[in-house]
Amino acid sequence: MKQLALVTGGAASGKSAYAERRIQEMFSAAKLPEKRLIYLATMFNDGGPEAAARIRRHRALRAEKGFETIEKPCDLEALLSDNRIWKSQEGAAGEYPAAPKGVSADLQGGFILLEDLGNLLANERYLSEGRLSGVCADPPMRVEEPNLSAPGGNEDRQYYPEDALLREYILAPLLTMAEAASALVIVSNEIFSDGETYPPETMRYIRALGLLHRWIAEEADEVTEVVCGLPLMKKGRIGEG
């Protein structure tokens, strides 16, 4: 694996701006101008005004920074091999001027900013083409896991059918991408601290995102939470002992 970083934060925390600076720092430090600086956008564009406004805002943030954009709301595995992915060069006004181009060679050794993990998970769960959509309504199962501190040496835990699929369809492609790229920075949302209890389906989504955060953090060189624009290092710093 090359360089893998996870950046989390609440809404309007400054996580996107920090993640952009971080991937640009990695790109500059590597001194590999022949490699690509890639923005991997996972938001599903439904053509509505809210989606258009968010796209315009993020395009403005990245204006003239040299990013190439790949739009892929779900099915990251296809991104690693499929030649029907749409890619665009940042900077043009209006909608993305997209053209079909295989991206496998582009990803190899590239510096990739993925924004964001929460959208990717939601799309895999709720879009008709999402590969988790068929199992997310299945009831949880109870399993016993070894736990020496629990009575009898075992602990009852809930297991959801999509847990293994989260690893297969989201985590594994992300780790493959990180291995192929020079650097991968993943942006995600901090949605775990408000103390509220939501409907079961929402809580199930929150749980799934938490699992992904935990698994990615275990593999990452660097984990940062951004609060009020300030990066709080949770794990490591790439390039530092």
Where are these regions (language model features)?
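Residue-level signal for inorganic ion chemistry
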Residues: A19, H58, L113, N189, ...
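Short, glycine/serine-rich, charged loops/turns that create anion-binding
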Residues: A11-A12, F44-D46, G118, I191-F192, ...
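Residue-level preference for the first positions of well-ordered beta-strands
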Residues: L4-L6, R36, G109-F111, A183-V185
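Conserved P-loop
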Residues: K2-G102
